[in-house]
């Protein structure tokens, strides 16, 4: 199956689902988790950047023994709304009891350095413990594909990306995820415009791609 055939197959599956699932959503919500604590920008201290964040939200999390690793999204100014991803740790028992240190120490792990992150940065980590370290799915928002044809910051591509860290949280590599042959110039690589992905057992990955002409 070629890349274009794969994309058309995914579109057709999505269209079939939409034809069956359309309707009005009922006015009902059900909390699946107990709220323990809120962590806002006033509650954190970023150790490796001089400015205080204006927003701290959408954290990824990894439970390792009795320690919770948090990977929050950090926004330091609203003009460009560029994001970085930080790292903090909390004892599980303290988190369950609603106790956090004030301020909570946070270190920036990921920030925009590549063209595919050059507009709005690194967003919304989904973190996983992997052999030899940690893996973070995130959304890189920058210049990729047709977005490279203009300098306008209003034109960008949001792309599923993956960063790998060693045991000491030193970055080993990061890149956008694509299916197919390496090298965009071949026309045989399908980049995945999606904000949701997670590892399943082994090396299997669960994706929710965004497809042209279909609602997210």
Predicted regions and their residues:
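Beta-rich carbohydrate-recognition and catalytic domains
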Residues: 1-54, 62-120, 128-216
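Extracellular/lumenal glycan-associated surfaces
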Residues: 58
């Amino acid at each position: 199956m070629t890349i274009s055939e794969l994309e058309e197959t995914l579109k057709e599956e999505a269209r079939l689902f939409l034809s069956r699932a359309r309707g009005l959503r009922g006015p009902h919500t059900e909390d699946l988790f107990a709220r323990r604590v809120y962590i806002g920008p006033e509650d954190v201290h970023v150790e490796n950047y001089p400015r205080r964040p204006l927003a701290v939200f959408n954290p990824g999390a990894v439970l390792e023994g009795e320690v919770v690793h948090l990977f929050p999204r950090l926004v330091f100014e609203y003009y460009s709304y560029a994001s970085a991803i930080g790292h903090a740790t909390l004892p599980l028992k303290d988190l369950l009891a609603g106790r956090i240190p004030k301020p909570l120490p946070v270190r920036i792990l990921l920030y925009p350095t590549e063209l595919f992150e050059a507009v709005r940065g690194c967003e919304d980590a989904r973190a996983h413990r992997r052999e030899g370290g940690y893996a973070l799915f995130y959304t890189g928002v920058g210049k990729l594909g047709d977005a490279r044809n203009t300098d306008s910051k209003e034109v960008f591509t949001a792309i599923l990306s993956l960063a790998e860290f060693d045991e000491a949280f030193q970055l080993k590599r990061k890149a956008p995820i694509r299916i197919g042959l390496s090298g965009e110039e071949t026309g045989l690589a399908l980049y995945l415009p999606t904000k949701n992905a997670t590892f399943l057992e082994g090396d299997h990955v669960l994706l929710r791609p965004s497809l042209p002409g279909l609602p997210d």
